[in-house]
């Protein structure tokens, strides 16, 4: 069985138009990953009066290549740029139109938000919400979801959907990867009813869940059957918080947290390679984080998240790539800042971190005992 990833899929099926090969789950991931590309001044912003103004995928790819920015970008944006180049090669996507591009970073309100529309040749619209980028700011907002709803990007996602979608009756698919998947669901739940009726599918590609109160909303229950949550076998991000929908598990060629990268997900023909269940590693981490988070009250969650963010920013870390590129310097800076934290904050961080490590240890022991029982019983 020959398998590949979304890049290979574009090579295999890039010249199949949507009348021959209808929209599928792999197309969803391609368009979800596309929103990570740096398309400022390449794809038009939302227009007044919901006017559709955009550029074709082939034109956007030409402009992006001419700008030279892909080579200067972080890996996440680079991969999305290369994906756009590949999309432009075949008739499946080359004439699709990109528009309503937004890319916003608000450090004061701790918000990172990016999205775009893809007007497809099958006369549908795909609204793609970007996940968390390389900034510490973006990850801070993700962590805020552990105690806050809505976070600024969730509110922005609803406003974006309601104000930018043309009122022409076309059917809409909405999706995103990582935090983008969470935003896709949130916007679909909270938008006005007439718009909601046009939404046919909502794709959450390894995105975090919600606080329990979200799942109890009538508006969530109403659209629940239109949600597809897709996660890799060792999903970590996609298992955070609560999910009211079932999920599909896909094979990944990467290990651990690196499976979060959608380019590692395995594709066979026009679908993902599916598995029956998540890996034992994912289950252990899920149990650990779930028990640990539930053991913290809202005040402790806020204090811990704020302390981690303060530690990173004071150490001069603005991007995750800083940690990789200047690892020794940054770790040294973090150690210095740890000692400069107020005594109460430092004590709180040590206590909560110890609780996390302890819970992980307990779950590892449970896994080992479970494996032994299965072996003894010949399972």
Residue ranges and their predicted role:
Residues 1-116, 120-125, 129-146, 150-159, ...:
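Alpha/beta hydrolase fold serine-hydrolase catalytic domain that processes acyl esters and thioesters
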Residues 175-180, 184:
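Gly/Ala-rich beta-loop-alpha elbow adjacent to hydrolase catalytic centers
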Residues 184-193:
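Short glycine-enriched nucleophile-adjacent loop
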